[in-house]
Each structure stands twice: as structure tokens, then as C-alpha cells.
């Protein structure tokens, strides 16, 4: 559509039909074009038709969306907790803080376990990334990033490298060595580059590829060695806040969540969204696959956690209580999948019975909001990070 049209005629060549005629200067996208009266009318009509087409397409999309929800509702004949009525209730549940990791000078924003079940990497608003020995609480490596708010970090499957990023819009990979005095920053490799902050990153099943999520509304798959973009994933309508790779050796799908209230499942080979779920009422802060890979959980600012069954293509459970009014910032499953651990902005960690939908425990200890939470690879413990500058290992 035109910005504005002046009805002052001049004589010359029309920029559309190239005939010598009386012209009208027309400003389109701040650029002056000279059209004859016939072409100017055609352009105005085309603009109206374009608006009508967009409106009809939007209406058709909403209609199809409604029909899809109707078809889903026909299959929604039973709830998960009804199926689980005959399942035995969980016994007494006790977990305590076994280790407290202190060393960050500001809010802990992200953490990840090494496959060796012992080491932990964490990132913070203080601009530091620290590798910890969770048994001794000693710091093994520390990297100072060029920016604050290091919002994402991940351990490589081999345990020989870490990846991190944040407000620098980049994902950087640092190799780890046995020499603790070696300058890690000198070996830094910038792998991914987004147009907005990096919110999450995760290696695939090898050290050679990494997935990233960003505030620019996209996810991307990168080659670590060359830094080449292998695949980009477009579909979220706002910042992407989290992602999780499907738990299989040939994991070719991942799930992401964002500020558009959506959780989306992607095919890494085609770059296409294969499933989308939009039942949350606020930002989706965290997503985590069920151990079998057939479902995933999400945590949101709407103070609920939800379970989605990928085979049934729908939400099957909501984990919430009237007394919980603060958002869920991070979620993860126990190794068996029976428990769902969820960190909240009210400083607590709630433990949910996945099958029955009931809360089995509430863990206190942090003095500020719980920002990140991950279960160890062997399932014997989990680690939580908080805005109180500490990480806690629970078992």
C-alpha cells in the first residue's frame, strides 16, 4: 500500500507502464515513484485486494484450527489420572540438600550435568561459567564471558567441552583440559550467531553439532567445527526460551517453548514443525522430554506444569494447585518418569506424581527464585540453580 499520494501532476515516463503521460508522485515505502493516473488506480486496487486476501486467509486458518480442536476433543475420552487410579500411590518421599555450590557472584541462570554423573557446568548473570565437581564442591574450571547474563550452558556428550552464550547473541564452545591453569578463553570457538540473545543450547548426540534457541524467535542447528548453519527452525511468534532434544540415539526431533505460549516439536532433518501445542496461558519457560520420548512436560509463567502425549497429540495432565501462584521456571523427570521435579519463582521445588497428578513433596532451601533444574544422568540426584547465587545438589 502507498504511504501517501500527491495530486500534483507532472509530465514524464510512468514508472510502471513507461508511457509518456501526466504523472502523480507516489511515495511507497518512503521511496518516490511517478505513476500515471491509470497505474495509480490499479496499485490502490491491488492494495485493497491484498488486504482482503490476507483477511480471508486468516479467517480460513482460524476455521481450520477450530476443526482440528474438535477432532482432538473427540479422542479425548479419558484423563491420565483416571487410568492411573489402580496404580499404587508413592510412599514417603524424602530428599535433602547434600551439597551447596557457592562461587557465583550473581543469579545462577542455567546448569547442566556431565555424562560422568559427577561434574556440573553452570552459568550466571555475573558473566562467569564454572565447571564444578559435585562430590567435593570444588571448582575445576572458570571462564569469564565478554558479557553478563550468560543464559545458556551445556556439557558436550564426551565431557571434553562446554558450550555457553547469552546477551552476546553467540554460542561459544570451550574445550576442557586436565591443565586447570590453561587459558580456556584462548581456545574459545564461536559457533552460532543469532540476531538476539541466546536463551538455550544443547549438543546433539555428538560433540559435532549443537542446537540453539534465541530471543530472535528461531532455533538453529550448527556444525561445531565449521560454525556453519545446518538448519534453521522458524515458527515461534516470539522469543524462544527453551529446548530439549528427544532422548534416543537417533534423536531427530526436539521440542521448544517460548513467549508465544506455544510448545513446538520439530523435525531436525526437514526444519519443519511436526506438532504444536498451545494450552498454556503465559510464557513457556521450560520443556523436557519424558524418558521414553513419547511425551514431554512444560513449565510456564501461568503457574502450571503440563504433560503432552505426542502419540495422542494432546495435553494429558496439568500439575497445579490453587496455592501455587508463581510461575514454573524449570522442569525435569526422574529416570523412571514417575516423578516430575519443578522449580518455581516462589523459591520452592515441587515434586509431582506424573501419573496421579498430585504433589508428593515440596522442597525448601533456596532463598530466591529457582531458575534451573536438572536430574543427574544416573537419576540418583538432581541439581537446582537459583537467583540466590547458589546451586544445590539434592538426593
Curated annotation (Swiss-Prot):
Tissue expression as described in the entry: Isoform 1 is only detected in retina. Isoform 2 is detected in brain (at protein level). Isoform 2 is detected in brain.
Lineage of source species: Eukaryota, Metazoa, Chordata, Craniata, Vertebrata
Family named by the database record: Belongs to the WD repeat G protein beta family.
Name of this chain's protein: Guanine nucleotide-binding protein subunit beta-5
InterPro entries: G-protein_beta_WD-40_rep, Gprotein_B, Guanine_nucleotide-bd_bsu, WD40/YVTN_repeat-like_dom_sf, WD40_repeat_CS, WD40_repeat_dom_sf, WD40_rpt
Location(s) in or outside the cell: Membrane
Gene3D superfamilies: YVTN repeat-like/Quinoprotein amine dehydrogenase (2.130.10.10)
Purpose: Enhances GTPase-activating protein (GAP) activity of regulator of G protein signaling (RGS) proteins, such as RGS7 and RGS9, hence involved in the termination of the signaling initiated by the G protein coupled receptors (GPCRs) by accelerating the GTP hydrolysis on the G-alpha subunits, thereby promoting their inactivation. Increases RGS7 GTPase-activating protein (GAP) activity, thereby regulating mood and cognition. Increases RGS9 GTPase-activating protein (GAP) activity, hence contributes to the deactivation of G protein signaling initiated by D(2) dopamine receptors.
WD repeat feature ranges: 103-142, 145-184, 193-234, 236-278, 279-318, 320-362, 365-394
Alphabetical list of PANTHER family matching this protein: GUANINE NUCLEOTIDE-BINDING PROTEIN BETA G PROTEIN BETA (PTHR19850)
UniProt keywords, alphabetically: Membrane, Repeat, Transducer, WD repeat
GO biological process: dark adaptation; G protein-coupled dopamine receptor signaling pathway; G protein-coupled receptor signaling pathway; light adaption; negative regulation of voltage-gated calcium channel activity
Amino acid at each position: 500500500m502507498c504511504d501517501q499520494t500527491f495530486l500534483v501532476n507532472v509530465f514524464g515516463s510512468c514508472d510502471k507502464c513507461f508511457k509518456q503521460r501526466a504523472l502523480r508522485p507516489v511515495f511507497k515505502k518512503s521511496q518516490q515513484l511517478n505513476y500515471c493516473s491509470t497505474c495509480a488506480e490499479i496499485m490502490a486496487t491491488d492494495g485493497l485486494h491484498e488486504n482482503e486476501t490476507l483477511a480471508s486467509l486468516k479467517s480460513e486458518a482460524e476455521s481450520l484450527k477450530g476443526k482440528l480442536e474438535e477432532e482432538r476433543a473427540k479422542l479425548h475420552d479419558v484423563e491420565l489420572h483416571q487410568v492411573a487410579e489402580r496404580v499404587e500411590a508413592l510412599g514417603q518421599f524424602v530428599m535433602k540438600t547434600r551439597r551447596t555450590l557457592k562461587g557465583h557472584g550473581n543469579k545462577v541462570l542455567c546448569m547442566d550435568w556431565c555424562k560422568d554423573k559427577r561434574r556440573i557446568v553452570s552459568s550466571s548473570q555475573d558473566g562467569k561459567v564454572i565447571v564444578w565437581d559435585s562430590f567435593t564442591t570444588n571448582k575445576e574450571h572458570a571462564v569469564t564471558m565478554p558479557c553478563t547474563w550468560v543464559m545458556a550452558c551445556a556439557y558436550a556428550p564426551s565431557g571434553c567441552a562446554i558450550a555457553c552464550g547469552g546477551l552476546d547473541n553467540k554460542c561459544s564452545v570451550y574445550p576442557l583440559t586436565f591443565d586447570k591453569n590453561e587459558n580456556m578463553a584462548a581456545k574459545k570457538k564461536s559457533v552460532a550467531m543469532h540476531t538476539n540473545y541466546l536463551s538455550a543450547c544443547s549438543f546433539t548426540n555428538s560433540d559435532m553439532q549443537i542446537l540453539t534457541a534465541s530471543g530472535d524467535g528461531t532455533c538453529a542447528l550448527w556444525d561445531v567445527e565449521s560454525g556453519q548453519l545446518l538448519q534453521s527452525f522458524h515458527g515461534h511468534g516470539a522469543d524462544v526460551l527453551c529446548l530439549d532434544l528427544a532422548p534416543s540415539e537417533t534423536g531427530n526431533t526436539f521440542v521448544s517453548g517460548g513467549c508465544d505460549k506455544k510448545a513446538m516439536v520439530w523435525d531436525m532433518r526437514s526444519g519443519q514443525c511436526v506438532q504444536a501445542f498451545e494450552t498454556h496461558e503465559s510464557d513457556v519457560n521450560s520443556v523436557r522430554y519424558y524418558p521414553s520420548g513419547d511425551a514431554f512436560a512444560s513449565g510456564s509463567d501461568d503457574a502450571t506444569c503440563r504433560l503432552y502425549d505426542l502419540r495422542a497429540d494432546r495435553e494429558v495432565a496439568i500439575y497445579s494447585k490453587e496455592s501455587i501462584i508463581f510461575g514454573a521456571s524449570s522442569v525435569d523427570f526422574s529416570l523412571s518418569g514417575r516423578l516430575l521435579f519443578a522449580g518455581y519463582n516462589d523459591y520452592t521445588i515441587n515434586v509431582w506424581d506424573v501419573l496421579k497428578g498430585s504433589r508428593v513433596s515440596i522442597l525448601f532451601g533456596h532463598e530466591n527464585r529457582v531458575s534451573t533444574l536438572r536430574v543427574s544422568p544416573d537419576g540418583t540426584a538432581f541439581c537446582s540453580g537459583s537467583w540466590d547465587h547458589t546451586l544445590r545438589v539434592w538426593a
